[in-house]
A protein has these predicted regions:
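Non-catalytic alpha/beta scaffold blocks inside enzyme catalytic domains
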Residues: 252, 256-544, 597-601
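Intrinsically disordered, low-complexity segments enriched in Ser/Pro/Gly/Ala and basic residues
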Residues: 521, 529-530, 553, 573, ...
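Intrinsically disordered, low-complexity peptide-like regions
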Residues: 383, 388-393, 555, 568, ...
């Protein structure tokens, strides 16, 4: 009671207007242990609010100086931008030079704050916790598959919070996961559209599907191409694949640009060490990847391993400003060749490590010698017993939530994998009809082809489409996503589709019915069973895949000297949902120094 009295001495009694109300630690403790009258007769301390950017709203008079936020920023996020100034009654928590926190994890301080001093700026006065429907699901903003809770009020997603999962995201989530949810309310496709007289006009489902079917019938199957986007679940991708099989067409792709994938065994295209396994490692080598932007929660684990054990971290290619110290070993493919040929000092460090980790990014595999880089590193690790039953040092870091699942579904044919036939046909304008399933990041310029776009947002794909078929976003339909470790997790619908939008697999059913007078799948249950049967080394939901015996394969690996440039990701604008989000737009403007900071914000 005494401690509570001290804590509440300077605390304003503004619970009714505080966003933390109903889920506040201080409120709960006061309820159990507090007294109903204050003996504090002096003037209460008042502190001016600080600017912490577009994500965190401050009311520093409520602050009880627990310094959780300071410790989080320094120790977990690795961006020491919060601190305390003054002493005694004049102590204040603030950012240096009053500017927004430049971290991809900054929103987690809101969950850590035990009072209402730090709250979510986009969520201010939106709802009370008991009014919201809460759904436990997974995130699809990157390939990590962070466990999240989606809070909805009727159709609207009001906020997204983390769920503790020690194997994946611990208790943190990235700012993009947490704050891009306002993009789910904007730029939505709610009715089918058909392009008439060079203008998109609303139409009925029947009219749109009749036009689509007639178009498909009039075109040779070799001249039809399909591209699957970055947030498509396993079931919808499988129904798309089956639909293309009915059309007798093999031109399917999911990569947004060329990069090498060896899909012969599962360990070639997943993060074998596992996210939790990063903490056990004693040396990390990054090749052509910037984990801070490509997989924020993987970067947080690397930061944790570095902070706890000071493990040495090396990089080939310059990833820019990471949240830990690292050494650049070089920036071209020849530097990898030198390591493998024992020509550099680093070779000894790698061999003396007991549990090294090598993380290969899409930027390295996108080179002409991407195949050489991957296969030779794999051979090297096998030869030196770094790929065993207990430890696999080889890790591929995909950037999209759907990547691993789509490789499992064999969307890549062997032929396509070797020579990127989809991209070649696309560049040579060989497609007369292009079907985009939630695909907004493909570098595509409309020429003469007929484009069908099926997705949730009026983004880059819908912009150039001749027919638009509206489908739900990830929060509005059930589906399985396989994360970068190869762990299948269910994404559960927390809301419902907007307007006349239909689930993707039901749309393919409608088209197939018009084409062949029968459904592709009779119900979602049979589609789910078919999808689970396709998963390689399936070991049950939420579990890592079964270990497999590696096949001996000989490859002709052509080496070319090339510079390894890590492709810069527009982090806050990486997909259709985040591009529709005003909050993400504000974050991006600050990142690019377009917004005034500090008191002028």
């Amino acid at each position: 009671k005494g401690v509570m009295e001290f804590l509440l001495a300077n605390h304003p009694l503004d619970c009714p207007v505080c966003d933390q109300g109903g889920e506040c630690d201080l409120q709960d403790q006061s309820m159990f242990y507090g007294i109903d009258k204050s003996r504090f007769k002096e003037n209460k301390r008042a502190v001016p609010d600080k600017n912490m950017g577009p994500l965190i709203k401050t009311q520093m008079t409520r602050c009880i100086h627990c310094t959780r936020c300071v410790r989080f920023a320094t120790e977990v996020a690795g961006v020491p931008e919060l601190g305390a100034i003054g002493r005694g009654e004049d102590m204040q928590i603030t950012t240096y030079l009053e500017q927004s926190i430049k971290s991809e994890l900054s929103g987690n301080v809101i969950d850590l704050c035990p009072v209402g001093a730090l709250t979510s700026k986009p969520y201010v006065f939106e709802a009370r916790p008991w009014e919201l429907k809460k759904t436990e699901t997974v995130d699809v903003m990157d390939a990590v598959g962070s466990n999240i809770r989606v809070d909805t009020y009727d159709w609207e997603v009001k906020r997204i919070l983390p769920i503790i999962n020690e194997d994946i995201n611990e208790e943190w989530i990235s700012d993009k996961t947490r704050y891009s949810c306002d993009g789910l309310l904007k730029q939505r496709l709610d009715v089918p559209y058909i392009k008439k007289d060079n203008k998109l006009q609303k139409s009925s489902w029947d009219e749109a599907i009749s036009l689509l079917v007639n178009k498909i019938k009039s075109i040779n199957s070799n001249e039809i191409g399909g591209h699957i986007g970055d947030m498509v679940n396993l079931e919808n991708a499988l129904s798309f694949k089956k639909f293309f099989k009915v059309l007798n067409c093999n031109n399917l792709e999911f990569r947004e640009r060329k990069f090498y994938i060896n899909s012969s065994e599962k360990s070639n295209y997943i993060f074998n060490t596992s996210i939790k396994g990063i903490e056990e490692s004693d040396l990390i080598l990054l090749i052509g990847t910037n984990p801070r932007h490509e997989a924020t929660m993987v970067n947080a684990r690397i930061r944790k391993a570095f902070a706890q054990k000071k493990i040495p971290i090396f990089s080939i290619g310059n990833p820019g400003n990471l949240t830990y110290d690292y050494t650049i070993l070089g920036n071209n493919s020849e530097d990898i060749k030198k390591i493998l040929n024992k020509e550099v000092e680093f070779y000894k460090k790698l061999l003396s490590a007991k549990k090294p980790i090598i993380i290969i990014g899409e930027s390295a595999l996108g080179l002409k010698s991407g195949k050489y880089i991957f296969e030779e590193i794999k051979n090297f690790l096998k030869k030196n017993n770094f790929i065993t039953k207990d430890w696999n040092a080889l890790n591929f870091l995909p950037q999209n939530a759907s990547t691993v699942g789509l490789i499992d579904l064999k969307i890549l044919s062997e032929e396509n994998e070797k020579n990127y036939s989809f991209f070649e046909k696309l560049n040579n304008n060989e497609f007369k009809l292009l079907y985009l399933l939630g695909s907004d990041n493909l570098n595509l310029k409309k020429t003469n082809e007929f484009i069908i776009y099926q997705g949730s947002h009026g983004d880059r794909g819908a912009e150039i489409a001749d027919i638009i078929l509206p489908s739900p976003a990830y929060t509005e339909q059930n589906g399985i996503f396989i994360n970068l470790e190869g762990r299948p997790q269910e994404c559960v619908a927390g809301s419902y589709p907007t307007g006349e939008a239909k689930e993707d697999w039901l749309i393919f059913n409608l088209i197939h019915q018009k084409l062949k007078n029968k459904k592709l799948f009779s119900n979602f249950k049979s589609l789910r069973e078919n999808s689970l049967a396709e998963i390689k080394n399936f070991n049950g939901m939420n579990n890592l895949p079964k270990k497999e015996k590696g096949k001996k394969m000989s490859f002709k690996n052509e080496f070319q000297k090339e510079k390894i440039e890590i492709r810069e990701i527009d982090y806050y604008f990486s997909n259709a949902i985040s591009r529709a989000s005003k909050t993400m737009s504000d974050c991006r403007s600050i990142q690019k120094n377009k917004l005034l900071e500090g008191t002028n914000y």
